[in-house]
């Protein structure tokens, strides 16, 4: 999952750094705000959402070139980026303007062993 060729391994690394720097903070911060974990004024929330939308535009554009981030096969970069994008709804970021992202998410969800994050978290016993 780390890439097959030297070039693909380099692209995986680029995506991992991009995810950490450009995508994750700008999805998780507005998510934290909407869930009440952070108290900020509306301008701060909107700033993070706009930065997330900028990142999603980049992602959508790049995904127009192929089924996965670094080519025809999924890599750890796809898993990492998916993990952030999956929380966009909780940040009240609409993914409908990003058709390539939505299609890619569907492909990631069809990978062997895929599970939604909610299915992996411990559940409180209802009894």
What do these predicted ranges mean?
Residues 64-65, 110:
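The C-terminal cap of the DNA-recognition helix in HTH/winged-HTH DNA-binding domains
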Residues 17, 32, 106, 122-123:
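Short amphipathic alpha-helical surface patches that mediate protein-protein
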Residues 1-50, 60, 67:
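GST-like domain detector, emphasizing the conserved glutathione-binding G-site
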Residues 12, 59, 78, 108-111:
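Residue-level signal for nonpolar/aromatic packing positions in well-ordered secondary structure
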Residues 114, 119-127:
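C-terminal helix/juxtamembrane-tail motif
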Residues 48-55, 104:
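Alpha-helical packing segments of well-folded alpha/beta enzyme cores
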């Amino acid at each position: 999952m780390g890439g097959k060729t030297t070039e693909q391994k380099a692209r995986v690394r680029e995506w991992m750094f991009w995810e950490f720097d450009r995508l994750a903070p700008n999805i998780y911060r507005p998510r934290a705000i909407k869930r009440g974990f952070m108290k900020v004024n509306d301008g701060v929330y909107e700033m993070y959402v706009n930065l997330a939308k900028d990142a999603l535009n980049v992602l959508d554009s790049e995904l127009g070139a192929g089924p996965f981030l670094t080519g025809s096969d999924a890599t750890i970069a796809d898993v990492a980026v998916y993990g952030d994008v999956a929380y966009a709804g909780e940040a009240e970021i609409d993914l409908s303007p990003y058709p390539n992202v939505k299609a890619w998410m569907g492909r990631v969800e069809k990978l062997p062993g895929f599970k939604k994050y909610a299915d992996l978290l411990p559940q409180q016993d209802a009894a």
